[in-house]
Amino acid sequence: MMNRVAVLDVVGLTRGLIGEFTPRIAAFVEAGQVSSFKPAFPAVTCTAQSSYLTGLPEEQHGIVANGWYDREAAEVKFWKQSNHIVKGEKIWEKLRKVNPDFTCAKLFWWYNMYSSADWTITPRPAYPASGRKVFDVYSHPMEMKEEIKSELGDFPFTSFWGPKAGIGASQWIAGSAKWVERENQPTLSLVYLPHLDYCLQQYGPDLSDARVNVELGKIDALVGELLDFYAERDVEVMLLSEYGISAVDQPVHLNRLFREKGWITIKDELGLEMLDCGASKVFAVADHQVAHVYINDASLMEEVRELLENTSGVDEVRAPEGYSAERAGDMVVVSNPNAWFTYYYWLDDALAPDFARCVDIHRKVGYDPVELFLDPELKFPKLAIAKFLLKKKLGFRALLEVIPLDASLVKGSHGRDNVPVDEQPILVTQGSVKYDVISRPEEVADRIMQRVLGR
């Protein structure tokens, strides 16, 4: 007989944030067993989740960041969806071998397409030939998304990422988890709640900031709602997070440094600048506080290392040993605790590519947290958005250029693995069985399986 378990992945939750403004979470932690542990490296969503769900370190599951440079295609690829990208046996596959009746629902965790989990749902826009982007989700079974949308409405994509990101996306995901539980009663439910990821990057992890406290209260209320829901259905809940957010005030522009050295190749496209990775001698794929540096000209290896080691804001330059060789950079760079890496490569904002001022997570050669902000220099941002939406409704192609190019706006980041305990991810379990404190992200998989198996 297996226990039914729901794992709530509350992104950004740490010991340092639990307290006055999170009474439901605080009570759950007080009544259970909590482990703070060294995060995955890099401490980003795709790497952390892959370690949790395979029990393997990065060099074995292969997820070196949220995106990386594909050397064969000579393209940077971020936020891909196929579960086949993650190497290794997943925990639901292991548990199914123990008991063929075991089932798993994977709700908005990443790499959620073509997974062997029983029920999955993930954000997946449609891209018609007209060039439009139509917000939608993907599910397995395929018909499930329409059934869920008929009850919850369309997924609020703009609250999942961008300047309007907020609690709405996490509420919809929680609603989909309830729907799947009522309809299917999975043995294991994996539920992704990203809300804190937004405000903590916008404002920093500052508990003296009333805006942060308000957002903590929102996620606490939602977690409390799920705790009550699952308790009524005799489902054990585990609380989990992926990383903590560190306060930052120093953006570091590695690709601009490389460009000044003459190592970056720029392609002119309609008067704007595009980074040509395949033709560049050296370039960086930035992901929060970690960057993979790819060196196409091996003769520059030592010169690149010396430049990086003497760059303000850089804490470490690591060798790629221990990382997935075909995906990782030739060097892996870690920022100082107060710094983070941009993808910026242009030296004149007037020549920035057209997607730079848009929410465009796939074209940018790195992660861009500035997408969480509206450009403060826009006099009438709501009017710009209204014009865009009108054009979109009429079937015209248009760019929603409302994102600033000011990296100093970002106040929180993550990615480092050497962080204080109060900024480490946590795992909270309930029940009478007392476990050893976990110390590594790979151990999360065993702990989840132990709870399902009642061990």
Regions found by a protein language model. Name each.
Residues R4-A6, P186-L190, E236, D330:
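Residue-level preference for the first positions of well-ordered beta-strands
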Residues Y435-A445, M449-V452:
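C-terminal helical/tail subdomains of lipid-metabolizing enzymes
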Residues A6-V7, R24, G217-R259, W263-I264, ...:
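Metal-dependent active-site segment of extracytoplasmic phospho-/sulfohydrolases and closely related
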Residues T122-S150, R211-A221, R256-L275:
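Acidic, His- and aromatic-enriched active-site or binding-groove loops in soluble protein domains
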Residues L56-D206, S280-V285, Q289-N296, L300-E316, ...:
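His/Asp/Glu-rich, glycine-adjacent segments
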Residues G12-R15, P42-A43, E58, W109-Y114, ...:
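Short, solvent-exposed loop/turn segments at secondary-structure junctions
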Residues G16-Q60, T103-A105:
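Short, structured active-site-proximal loop/turn typified by the sulfatase FGly-forming signature C/S-X-P-X-R
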Residues Y243-Q289, F341-Q424:
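Histidine-centered active-site microenvironments of extracellular/periplasmic hydrolases
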